[in-house]
Structures are given as structure tokens and as C-alpha cells.
Amino acid sequence: MKNFLAHHLKEKTFRRSKIDFAMNTYNLTDRCPVEVFKKDIPEGKLVEYLMSSAYLPFFKFEKIIDNKYYIDGGVYSDCPVDMLIDAGYDEIYVIKAFKKRIRYKHKKGIKIHIIGPRENLGSIMSFTQEGAKFKMKLGYYDTLKYLYNLDGNKYYFKNYSEEYYTKLFDKRVYKKIIKEYDKGILPKTDKEFILRTIEKICKEFKIERFRIYKLPYLLTRLKNKITNNKESKYYYFIKNIKIEFE
């Protein structure tokens, strides 16, 4: 891991960046937490500090920084928001990789945005490249969903009004649609029902999940696909839905 990081990390580029960096770790030798910002990391020690911040000695326990033992900072603070508050940041976005609640100081004038995963991310012992890429994409798109108020549960749709969705079906046809496809929990709105059904169709046709979709263009794509899949249980839904451009 050390050789991998040393090969791929460009410390000069890291230090020239105007974006600050903060991390925490735990010094097992001295039995104390360590919190550092970019300026606190000694020259030439970036790789060691990064390794210490995520070190879990399941297979091998070795000294990392200055001949001392370190372990993942999560053993004392799995989301070190307080160090950012103490540094003077007044608006903080927290992207969690876990579902449990985080604890931090509540100070007047400090705004904390919490963005958590909507699904189980699996064990921290899962080190596959495929799994890591999935988690990064999920975190990125869930953040976009939060920032831009996107619609969708598993997928990401541009936000359209409730009124927009009421125009997508003729009233007579819509009654049949509801009866045919609303087999689960009753939706609160037409928008909720239609989006829920569209997501099921996207899953059936293996539509790429990590992308922001404008509904008219997505529906056009689904209509093209459904013409060759008349046996699909969603054929009647897609056939009758209208494509409404803003």
C-alpha cells in the first residue's frame, strides 16, 4: 500500500492546491488522538499520515510514523466534524459511509449538512476495486441529489413539479395504470407513483444508474426499448405515457 500511494500521490501538487485537507488518526504508542490539517503534515510524510488515518492491522501490525504505531482515527471519532468547527468553518457537508448518527458540537451559526447512504455499503473488510468504485459513485451522486434536490430513490432525476406528472397520462388511461401497476404501498402523489414505476422499468432494462436524467429524454429512450419488448409487464405503462418537454 505504501508503494502504491507513493507512486500515485503527487505531494507537491497536493500542497500547491488552494483546497485545505484535514484528517485524524490515533497514536497507539502514545495513546492519544491526532488531528492535522495540510499545514501540519511534515514535508515528505503525506503517505505515512494517509496510511495512519485508515490503518486497520488485521493482517500485519507495523510502525508507520516516526517509529510509532497508529490506527484508523475512527476508533475515537468516525466523523471528525469538531476539528472543522474549531478551525472556523461555518458550513460543513458530511458525506457518511455508515448509517449511525454522528456526534458533534452544536454551535450557533454553524450549519451542518448530513448526507448519508440510502443503502447498506457492506463490510469495511470488503476491499474489491469494484466495490470501492461503486461506493465512490454512490457518495458522489447522493451528494448531487442533496445539493440539486434531485428526484428518485435508486436513480437520479431532474426535479419536476407535481403538476408536470399529472400531464403524463390521460385521466382515463391513468386509472387503468394505477389499477395495473400500483400493487404495493399506496403512493402519496402521482409523482411518487410514476417515478417509482419508472425506476422499476429502468432496472428491468438495465439503464445506467449513476447519471442525472431529464425525464423527457429518458422516456424517449424507454419507449424505443419497449417497442422490441412487448412482453414486458411495463409495456402498457410506457406505451401510454406522454413525453412532455418543459
Which ranges hold each PLM region?
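Patatin-like phospholipase
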Residues: M1-E246
